A protein has these predicted regions:
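Alpha/beta enzyme core
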Residues: 2-209
Length: 210
């Protein structure tokens, strides 16, 4: 399988280390180079503020890599993966989490298959709105998973619509418990949307998740 970095399937040169890149092999079997691995990101927790963007085109992805953006989140449509593949190839050295559609997996086995499909085409991790059971199944299969807490748009009916959450004690405790459940399920990170900054500061002190 061709390398995302070299294009010819060969192991990247050791000189990659001099450029601050890590030599890797993807779950799909492609050699490549990345600015970060999951281990690197976890090692940075509490030490460095990283930048992330969501590119919607190959031009945006290439520009983000050139600008030194640390990580990218890429929308992944398993029925039409061509754009995700093109974005991966446009920014071959940047750590990418592919965002998997919630309704694309109805069982734990389907979640694992979907995660593998994303990893096969070059994802370094998957970002999901899955239940803890699905996350646990995927992580046990070796797939790095990022959960989703706080305001989860596709589940917003449970939190009163598209609005901030965590502004009272009950909601704050609920968010914290949700994040700890994801942590126990094996996730390495969690996206937390539209919650008070002070709450997030306190929660991050109490979890290993990024």
């Amino acid at each position: 399988m061709a390398s995302h970095a070299t294009g010819d399937g060969s192991i990247p040169s050791r000189d990659a280390n001099k450029k601050g890149l890590k030599r890797i092999m993807t779950v799909g079997g492609a050699y490549g180079t990345r600015n970060y691995t999951v281990k690197d990101l976890r090692d940075q927790k509490g030490k460095k503020t990283l930048t992330e963007t969501v590119p919607f085109s190959i031009e945006e992805a290439a520009a983000a890599e050139e600008a030194g953006i640390d990580t990218m989140k890429v929308r992944f449509d398993p029925k039409n993966p061509e754009l995700a593949i093109a974005i991966r190839n446009a920014a071959p050295n940047t750590f990418m989490a592919f965002s998997c559609p919630l309704i694309a997996a109805a069982t734990k086995d389907e979640a694992v298959k979907l995660g593998y499909k994303a990893m096969e085409i070059g994802a370094d991790a998957v970002m999901t709105q899955w239940s803890p059971e699905f996350i646990e199944a995927a992580t046990k299969a070796g797939i790095p998973v990022q959960g989703h807490a706080g305001l989860v748009p596709r589940r917003s009916t449970w939190t009163g619509g598209l609005k901030a959450v965590g502004k009272n004690l009950d909601e704050a405790i609920w968010i914290y418990n949700q994040i700890k459940i994801f942590e126990n399920a094996g996730a390495y990170a969690v996206e937390v949307e539209v919650i008070p900054e002070d709450l997030l500061i306190e929660i991050t002190k109490r979890t290993s998740l990024l």
